[in-house]
Amino acid sequence: MSTLVIVRHGQSEGNARGEFTGTSDVPLTQEGWSESRRAGSLLANLGISFDIAFSSALLRTVDTCRAILNETNGDLLEPIRRTELNERDYGQLTGINKNVARERWGQDVVQVWRRSYSTPPPGGESIRDISARVLPFLISEVFPPLLRGKSVLVVAHGNTIRSLKQGIERLTIQDTLAIESPTAAPTVYRIASDLSIIEKTNVLVGTVC
């Protein structure tokens, strides 16, 4: 049996401002740091440490990953940064407050851009585009160590986590779109040798934003 833990980054400054943060490389807030350390402490209390850890290339996931690893592994492991895990490119929505975007383009239009599978915001990515880069990463980089019985940590973003869970849990598109990931809230999977899920546990730490 192996262990896979997937965590969204702690609260970022973009989250705190209510923005479509996307590919903007914003730091964690103090609350985000606290959430991340708390997530690591909860995982350590479950007896979990990691053999390999991945983050996106964006600072908010790198710092969240380091804060978690400091609790579970000390300073013995450094996250591997992968651009495949980067947050969705929101195109023209990037950096805009969500309420301002709804006023500018209309709530229904913005909701389609956010939650349809194949319609991207202007100049940005759809969730289908994200799955096209995340699922190959999952197969080539995450599944092999799990098959060797290793413990793997992945710290990513709300939209890339949708695609990760789509692949791990074999979800339908509808179920994939329904996923909401609170900040710094680990999902712990116990994985069998055939990559089926033995047990799944959600550990609530942060908030959905």
UniProtKB/Swiss-Prot annotation:
Pathway: Carbohydrate degradation; glycolysis; pyruvate from D-glyceraldehyde 3-phosphate: step 3/5
Matches recorded under Pfam families: His_Phos_1
Catalytic activity entry: (2R)-2-phosphoglycerate = (2R)-3-phosphoglycerate
Gene it is expressed from: gpmA
Record's function text: Catalyzes the interconversion of 2-phosphoglycerate and 3-phosphoglycerate.
Protein name, entry field: 2,3-bisphosphoglycerate-dependent phosphoglycerate mutase
HAMAP family assigned: PGAM_GpmA (MF_01039)
Site label Transition state stabilizer, positions: H157
Catalytic site: H9 (tele-phosphohistidine intermediate), E87 (proton donor/acceptor)
Any one biological process term the GO annotation gives: gluconeogenesis
Keywords: Gluconeogenesis, Glycolysis, Isomerase, Plasmid
PANTHER family listed in its UniProt record: PHOSPHOGLYCERATE MUTASE
InterPro entries in alphabetical order: His_Pase_superF_clade-1 (IPR013078), His_PPase_superfam (IPR029033), PG/BPGM_mutase_AS (IPR001345), Phosphogly_mut1 (IPR005952)
A single GO molecular function term of this UniProt record: phosphoglycerate mutase activity
SUPFAM superfamilies: Phosphoglycerate mutase-like
Subunit architecture: Homodimer.
Family assignment from sequence similarity: Belongs to the phosphoglycerate mutase family. BPG-dependent PGAM subfamily.
E.C. number(s) listed in UniProt: 5.4.2.11
Residue positions binding substrate: 8-15, 21-22, 60, 87-90, 98, 114-115, 158-159
